[in-house]
Amino acid sequence: MLSGVLGGVLFHWLGGLASGSFYVPYKAVKKWSWEVYWLAGGFFSWIIAPWIMAGLLTNDLIPVLREGFSANPKACCLGYLFGMLWGIGGLTFGLTLRYLGMSLGMAVALGICTVMGTLIPDVYARTIIENIQSQPPYCVILLGLGVCLLGVIIAGFAGMSKEREMPAEEKKAAVKEFNFTKGILIALVSGFFSACMAFGIQAMEPVAEIAAEHGTGDLWVGLPKLCVILLGGFTTNFLWCLYLMLKNKTLYQFGTTTIQDPDQPGQTVKINYLSNLFFSALAGTTWYFQFFFYSMGETRMGEYKFSSWTLHMASIIIFSSLWGLVLHEWKGSSRFTKALLGIAIGTLLYSTIVVGYGNLMKEISAEPAAAVAVEAVEGEAAAQAVSEAVNQANATLDDLLEEGAAIEQQLEETVEEVLEEAN
C-alpha cells in the first residue's frame, strides 16, 4: 500500500476525481425532480456507503463509536454539528451560483472554503504564527495554499470569459438574478459552512485514536469519523429535500413508475424507476469516495494534516474542470478562454505539488531527528548495560572477597588446631 506524503497526495487526487465526477451519473436520471434524485443519492452518500465501508475495513465499528461517545462526547457532538453546518454550506452554494453566476460564484465560494478549511484549525489552536516563524516546511505549504487560490481566481476569470462569449439569450438567463452584494454575503456563508467538514474531521480525531487502539490499520482509522459527520450532513439535506418535496408535491415520485411530466404540465410519463435508482446510487456512492480517499490521504500527511484540505479542494476543481471539457461545456469558447482554463488547471496542479513538497520536507527533516533519538536511546541502553555489568562485577568481587575471608579464617583455625595437637 502507498505510504508517505506522495501516497497521501495521490489519495487526495483520487478523492478529487471522485468529487469532480460524482454528478455525471445524475445526468442519466430521467424525469425525477432534483430533490428526489438528490436525496436518493444522498442515502448512499451519507448513510449506506460510509457504514458499509467502515464496517468492512475497521475493527469493532459499533464499539469504537460507543466508546468514542462515552469517552469524548464533546468530540462526537462537534463532529455531528459540523456535519450539519457543512450540509448548509452545500445547499447555500447553489444560491451563490444563482446570484454571482457559475464562474464568479465558484471562485469566491471555493476560495473562501479552501482558505478557511486549511487555516482556521491552526488559527484556533493559536499555532500559526509560531509555525511560520519556526518551521520552513509550514511556510512552503502556505505558499501552496496561495498558489491554489491563484488557480481558483484564474478559473474564475476563465468562467467569466466563457460567460461573456455565450449567446445573448443564454447570457441574459445566466445573469438575470445577478446581485453582487447578496451573492458575496451568501458566498461567505457557503464557503465557511462548507469548510466545516474539515473542522469536523479534526474534531473527531479522538475517535480515530480509539479505532487504532482496537487494531484498525492506520490507513482506515478515519472511516468511523465519517459515519458521524456525514450523518449530520444527511440530517440537513434530508430536511431541506423533504421541505422541497412537500412544497413541490414530488414526494410521490419515490414510489411510482408513472409521474407528472415536468416538461409537459398536465401530462403523465412512465419512468425507468430502477435505472433512476441505480444512477442515483452510483452518483451518491461516487460522492462518498471523495472523503473515503480524503481520510486515507490525511493519514499520510504527517504533522501537517491541515494541508489535506488544500489538496482536496484543488483536486476537485482540477477534475471538475476536466469533466467540463469532456462534456463539451466549453464548446464554442475562444482559444483565449480555453487557454485561461488550461492555465488555471496547471496552476492548481502545481499547488498540489507545492503542498506535497512542503509535507515531504517535514517528513525528511523528521528522519534525522528520529535517527538521533534512536541513537540516544541505543546509547542510553548501552550505558545502562555497562553500568549493570560493572555492578554485577562489583557484586561478584564482593562475594569472592567474602569467600576468601572465610577460607582464610578457616585456615587459621586449622593451623591453630594442628599446633595444639603438636604441643
Model-derived segments and their meaning:
Residues M1-N423:
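Polytopic alpha-helical membrane proteins, predominantly small-molecule transporters/carriers
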